C-alpha cells in the first residue's frame, strides 16, 4: 500500500483548491512553448515577483500588489496583519471590479459556484510541485502548467485550461478572454527567462 502524502509532493500545498470541482472540469485548450533556458531559471522567475512591474504591465494592473514586487503582504520585513486595509495594492487580490485573470478582468458571469466569496475575492490560488508543474486557480477556470526540461538550456511549458462544462456551453462566455491573457503573461515570462539565461 502506497500512501499519498500531498505535503511531500507540493511545495505550495493544493489545499486552496478544495472547493474547485477539478474532477468535473474539462480541458478545453492546450498551449505549448519551448523556452531557451534552464528549468531552474524558469522556476526562479516563477517564484519571485521582482520582475513583475517591468515585465508584466497587464498583470500588475490586474493584481496591484505585484507592483510592489511581492506575492504576499507577509513577504515584507516587519509585516503585521492589518484588517482595515482594503486596497488590493496592500491587501492582495485583484483590482476593484476584476473577477479573474483575463483580458478585461471579467469572469463573464461564469464564476465557479462552489467557491466561497473570500476565494473569489482573493483572485487566484496556486499549488506547485517542483520541478514538474504548477496549478493556478481563478474564479472561472483552472490553468495547469507542466514544466518539461529537454536539455540543460531548454525547457518546454505545456499549459492546459480547464473549465466547467456549463461555462464551455455558455454561448456568451469567451474563453479566449482568459487564454489570451495567460499566454501573454507566459510569453513575457519566457522572454525574461531567456534574457536571464
Give the residues covered by each predicted segment:
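C-terminal catalytic domain of Rieske-type non-heme iron oxygenases
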Residues: 1-197
